[in-house]
Amino acid sequence: VLELCRTRLPDNMGIPADQIQVLSPTRRGLTGTVSLNRALQAALNPPAPDKHQKTWGELIFREGDRVMQTRNNYDVLWQKDDGEMGTGIFNGDVGHIAKIDPSGELLEIVFDDRTAVYTADMLAELDMAYAMTVHKAQGSEYRAVIFVSAPAAPGLMVRGVLYLSLIHI
């Protein structure tokens, strides 16, 4: 999975790593999104002296990371490049961390064409998004999808989960 995201798909098919989505039926275990996100972050966005980062719980948010909003927040202010402003970042919105101020208290996150500033106390609303569950990916589109699975709970290992992962290609 790491090699596919880091070199094989970008080099052989011209698909940038930020347009590749790894999907798993579960969050837990070796092939769950928690483990996959740790490994993918280390491979695709490792620490560097010129990258600021912020630790929150077990997560390390770093400039350049792909992140997902995990609950609706109707109060987050955002601004588009053309100056249009609005509020609301919603469960499942995926973006990337463009900037973390040196103190680590403010993070600038770009969601498609909207830029929002998050304070450190809002980090509970974010998760890494290099890998996500099939459930969270519903309704999204990606240039390339890598479906990762290993033996899991019987309820997760059904034909419908594979079907849902395939329709996101």
What are these regions (language model features)?
Residues R6-I167:
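Core RecA-like ATPase module of SF1/SF2 helicases and allied nucleic-acid translocases
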